[in-house]
């Protein structure tokens, strides 16, 4: 009997796995993962992300091997690998999930589809989460999302019949793949076991103060679920997190204690973030061009890439802007691969408004840094925080205010900017204002030990607002804003276009 091929992509798990479940109904399964060098050559990829993928592949192989059929892992062009596998096994059906990724994966999928047609192979794609293909507007999207999330989860297979053992174990194949970069080495551990442990600890202890603690980087590191890279690689399903968190919330809703109220509020907030997760990926699924072009076409040409100051971009990448809290956030993200959503939004806003860097440049830098890079969320959010979507509030963050609000005692700053460790709290947010005598006293001379600020943040913000106001006043933006709202706007809120009518689009948080 010919095997059914299951192509693992960004769904590296065996629990609640639609493609694997339905493939098994047709016959013995040949599970396949292909490391594609072409993908890893893109600007938004990094060795940090590969480390997470590599660990997740090893974990998946261990689970599949335990069920009876090891993972076949190869390195190369997807079509060429499929051709070799077809020559050996003669499979006529292939299952995978529907992937919403960057243009590279979209073009690869088109090539795979053409190859399948040429070999008369049936390729069946399954939903990965709440993203809907072929959607023209958002009129019924939330209802459809809810139906997917509330559907019964699919159990892991009891066993997999052995089709054939691979020439090399998956761990040996991936061990010889090197994705080099200079500084991006820190990452969360990958694999389904890690994902399940994070979800359990979040629902049992860490998540109680999630709602109140997600904004500050001092607390977000602990109170957030930290599941975002696992959602990005599919080591756990969004549906699992949704159902487990809502079941836990239901247990607390009948209780009156302060603890129960905190838990109920936090888990409600967490559920909202799971909804927004799919909401933003849906934008890229519906309109793939937003990887390269402004969501609102009326902003094409606004903040042109030619105006990007390379010296500012370099200081941004190095975490040497001279604004301590911003530098601390940049260094934390660059070294660990994670930062809470509010601070990510601040970094993008600072790059876009204060430094006047084109959003594409920022997208490439931060894309490499994020362990949890998810193209749909990434490009949508970068544009949203850069003010080029046309339906969201334009927020120009005040770096010093954020510093004082989110890190009042300078603990986060001193952790990530050790040059300022001896600087008194009174000066740590604005060390350039510190008297020279005090600089000598604490051993931190501005301009020598820590850089002069890249500019006056208040003045730079003022200039950015003036540019934005001038663009809006000299361009007809309302018609395109209506189109964007119809195609991409959430129906859970009474959002309005930013131009032509009064806007009402609150800032969203995607921390999970």
Would you name each region that the model predicts?
Residues 226-426:
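Active-site-proximal binding-pocket segments
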